[in-house]
């Protein structure tokens, strides 16, 4: 005789639940007769789930039948959606049954936020001298997070870059993540007591960390280590990748040891540099090691190990080049000086606009007749997000030369280096007579003293 099905929910057995893989949910119907049965899925708001649904063939179990239906949800739907369950709708003959299948929950962990305060001698370069603030959010889950900066309570819209979120190496237990954001600041703003705020938004909560040269918001006294990836400028000019490990909040340099190694344990030659004291009475140090560009680009993982008598155990920080990084080469446009400048017989200004690139790390240099110009001749802005394409960046570099140099027919070349370019470099050259971009040999600016891989 006909028998209606008994319906059971099926949920993922994966523990801890990952926020990177598809989340599986299912519905089991058993002990029904005859064998004809169908399934459908609805969201909590009753709209139909029309993707990721898979229904398996009916199986005979003794004198009756069983069948299952499975649905795969993208992690974003689980992490950012408001649904607490899906509805499995079972249709068998004249019988319809609805079953609520709870959506698994990813373990939520709030981020730990810390900001590194630069030392007095950390500012360098032509006026205005600059340094960087580092904001690290660590030990958080799930992965979705936003980091932004404020200066004196007002949002900072440019001059900072945020690295891709990376998983932490915790072994067992819930998967956690970390992210580092870097803000470029000027020495004058820092000494004028500007208050900088790192704002971290995660799962509807906001976390703040304020810093200034007065240390109004006292930083943590715990020793902190920050692994800093190689810059493209260093790779482009020196043909080697420099790993940097920044150690902060040191009460003393005594017993400090910073060492780099590969994930397999192979030690790397590490040079340690010490800094002067910070306004809050602590010290900082950095440990640098050069590795082959090929090893870095391949995604090989490296470890910074810090030991100090104030640490209960060695502190290890892992770093590797993100593999999921979106790479887009830049478009380069050179704009000659305006006619109004020539009429006024002022100094000549040439602009190089670099657009639509990713990642944000980029190198811009100016040449005169193929020779590098001094950095005090030009100013390059920090990469900023494209207004209409926030996953891409743009920057511009402004070169100023004398009217005599421009009128003499000197050629000026804007050289742009970026890892997504076919040969990592492109250039545009302009002069008074042509005003049109031409090619120039840029090999003179590249160092031959880089590291060699064996």
UniProtKB/Swiss-Prot annotation:
Residues 106-218 are annotated as: CH2. InterPro entries: Ig-like_dom (IPR007110), Ig-like_dom_sf (IPR036179), Ig-like_fold (IPR013783), Ig/MHC_CS (IPR003006), Ig_C1-set (IPR003597), Immune_Resp_Modulators (IPR050380). Residues 1-105 are annotated as: CH1. Glycans are attached at residues 45, 112, 192, 210, 238, 257, 280, 441. It comes from the Eukaryota. Residues 325-454 are annotated as: CH4. Keywords: Disulfide bond, Glycoprotein, Immunoglobulin domain. Disulfide bonds join 27-88, 135-198, 245-304, 352-414. Residues 219-324 are annotated as: CH3. PANTHER family: TAPASIN (PTHR23411). This is Ig mu chain C region.
């Amino acid at each position: 005789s006909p028998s209606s099905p008994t319906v059971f929910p099926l949920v993922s057995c994966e523990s801890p639940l990952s926020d990177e893989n598809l989340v599986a949910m299912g519905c089991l119907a058993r002990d029904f007769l005859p064998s004809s049965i169908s399934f459908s899925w609805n969201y909590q708001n009753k709209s139909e789930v029309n993707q990721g649904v898979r229904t398996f063939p009916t199986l005979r179990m003794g004198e009756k039948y069983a069948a299952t239906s499975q649905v795969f949800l993208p992690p974003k739907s689980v992490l950012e959606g408001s649904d607490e369950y899906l509805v499995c709708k079972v249709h068998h003959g004249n019988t319809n049954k609805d079953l609520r299948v709870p959506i698994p929950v990813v373990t939520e962990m709030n981020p730990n936020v810390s900001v590194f305060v630069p030392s007095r001698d950390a500012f360098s370069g032509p006026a205005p001298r600059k340094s960087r603030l580092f904001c690290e959010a660590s030990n958080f889950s799930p992965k979705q997070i936003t980091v932004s900066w404020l200066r004196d309570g007002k949002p900072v819209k440019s001059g900072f870059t945020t690295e891709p979120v990376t998983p932490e190496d915790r072994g067992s237990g819930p998967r956690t993540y970390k992210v580092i954001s870097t803000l470029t600041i000027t020495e004058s703003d820092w000494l004028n007591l500007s208050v900088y705020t790192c704002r971290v938004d995660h799962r509807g909560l906001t976390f703040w960390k304020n810093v200034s040269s007065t240390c109004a918001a006292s930083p943590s006294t715990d020793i902190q280590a920050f692994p800093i990836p190689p810059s493209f400028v260093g790779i482009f000019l020196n043909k080697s990748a420099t790993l940097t490990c920044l150690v902060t909040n040191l009460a003393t340099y005594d017993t400090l040891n910073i060492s780099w190694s590969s994930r397999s344990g192979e030690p790397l030659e590490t040079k340690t540099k010490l800094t002067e004291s910070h306004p809050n009475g602590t010290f900082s140090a950095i440990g640098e090691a050069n590795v082959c560009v090929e090893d870095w680009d391949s995604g090989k993982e490296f470890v910074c190990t810090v030991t100090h008598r104030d640490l209960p155990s060695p502190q290890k920080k892992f770093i590797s080049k993100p593999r999921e990084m979106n790479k887009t080469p830049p478009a380069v446009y050179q704009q000659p000086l305006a006619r109004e400048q020539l009429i006024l017989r002022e100094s000549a200004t040439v602009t190089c606009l670099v657009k639509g690139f990713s990642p944000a790390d980029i190198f811009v240099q100016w040449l005169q007749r193929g020779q590098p110009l001094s950095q005090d001749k030009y100013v390059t802005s920090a990469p900023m997000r494209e207004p209409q394409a926030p996953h891409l960046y743009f920057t511009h570099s402004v070169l100023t030369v004398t009217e005599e140099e421009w009128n003499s027919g000197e050629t000026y070349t804007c050289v742009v280096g970026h890892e997504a370019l076919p040969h990592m470099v492109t250039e545009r050259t302009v002069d008074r007579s042509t005003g049109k971009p031409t090619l120039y040999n840029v090999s003179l600016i590249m160092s031959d003293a880089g590291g060699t891989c064996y």
